[in-house]
Amino acid sequence: MNGEAKRTRLDQRRAPIQEALENFRRMRVVPFDVPGHKRGRGNPELTAFLGQQCVGVDVNSMKPLDNLCHPVSVIREAEELAADAFGAAHAFLMVGGT
């Protein structure tokens, strides 16, 4: 194999972050931290503009959703899927904004 380790292809149909956000949404957690729109309830204009599906999963990082600074679960899975898709050794997710 020309000195290359055999790679196992990952299931590229997976979307670990989206799956975790949907599971979290179904838990009906009431947030007491940021963002201030409180899953759309605190800002009807924003909800009308972006849609309930968007603001319903716009949440701060918490344990079930992993942490971008030190990913250990769903973000790490997503990074591994990205690396596999690109044929890279590693991939790192970044966000814009605050």
Where do the language-model regions lie?
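N-terminal glycine-rich, Lys/His-bearing helix-loop that initiates the first secondary-structure elements
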Residues: M1-V57
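Conserved N-terminal alpha-helix of the aminotransferase class I/II PLP-enzyme fold
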Residues: V55-T98
